Swiss-Prot record:
Enzyme Commission no: 2.1.2.10
GO cellular component, one term: glycine cleavage complex
GO MF, one example: transaminase activity
Subunit structure: The glycine cleavage system is composed of four proteins: P, T, L and H.
Sorted UniProt keywords: Aminotransferase, Transferase
Reaction catalysis annotation: N(6)-[(R)-S(8)-aminomethyldihydrolipoyl]-L-lysyl-[protein] + (6S)-5,6,7,8-tetrahydrofolate = N(6)-[(R)-dihydrolipoyl]-L-lysyl-[protein] + (6R)-5,10-methylene-5,6,7,8-tetrahydrofolate + NH4(+)
Example of a GO biological process term: glycine decarboxylation via glycine cleavage system
Source organism superkingdom: Bacteria
Function: The glycine cleavage system catalyzes the degradation of glycine.
Family, per entry: Belongs to the GcvT family.
Name the UniProt record assigns to this protein: Aminomethyltransferase
InterPro entries for the chain: GCS_T, GCS_T_bac, GCST_C, GCV_T_N, GcvT/YgfZ/DmdA, GcvT/YgfZ_C, TrmE/GcvT_dom1
HAMAP family, sorted: GcvT
Amino acid sequence: MANKTVLFNKHLESNAKMVDFHGWDMPLNYGSQIEEHHAVRQDAGMFDVSHMTVVDVTGTDACAFLRKLLANDVAKLKVPGKALYGGMLDDNAGIIDDLITYYLTDTFYRVVVNSATREKDLAWIAKQSQGFDVTVTERPELAMIAVQGPNAKAKAAAVFSSDQNAAIEGMKPFFGKQAGSLFIATTGYTGEVGYEIIVPETEAEALWQALLDQGVKPCGLGARDTLRLEAGMNLYGLDMDETINPLAANMGWTIAWEPTDRDFIGRKALEALRDAGTDKLVGLVMEEKGVLRHDMPVFFTDAAGVEQQGVITSGTFSPTLGYSIAMARVPNSIGDTAEVEMRKKRVAVRVVAPNFVRNGKQAF
């Protein structure tokens, strides 16, 4: 039996096409993936992300524990509510998961991890917490709704209470705040502004309906994937996994090398990889007809005249740009052009930074 989120019946009311997503019944779309995509780029859309896993880490050693567990450094978080993104690595510097961590107090951090990795994440966190004075608490009674797009904040404000709106007024990107029963965060997975709202399951249907009544368009997994790929955001299991280190996944910016005496899990292996040099994750753009897809081979000739090969990790048709885009893992000697093998022939592509669309506009 697949898991169902508390919003399952609301999806059916909106004629969602449901699919299995890592053991969860989730909406693929509500009729038109393209319309849902454009709604987020041009207006406001919302996603049920209640399948994500919310984990609270509390106790006197919470900061010290997370400084060991994560490649990014939670000690950088000085203002309550501030969040950071980063990887949780194994001893070989492979990525167990990518996650967001919110600093709420010196003894209370909230971590949001992926659904597909829930069981291994919880087991790893529990194992690594031994010897630290921390309590790790999963919060399955909390649902989550992401409201994204240029008009998302205004439409959400019409749903929030006056006290909630006052609590989050002027909140900067990558912050989260408890406002009444809602934990409201300025985070997302689309490259647009908006909120990710953690809500008690008992209130989730009412919040979803209130947002619907404000004209926020429900969006499924299909649009979520094209939006995150346009924004150059990794999808765990496609763009990186335990066989990939963060330097080869465009996550170098999330590694806190300083202070040098912080011995986070995977650090020694990661330093060796950094010194030896790794593959890198790049963006590809193909303006000809056709769609770049996961696992297609990528070829280029390096400066020494040697042919090199990489592979597409994520690819799609970009509704915003009107042509195909992809992320590919390639040797770091790549230049600004390459070829992708499609239907037994090679097609020229441009190589760009893996960030295609931000705030509705071309980003490269």
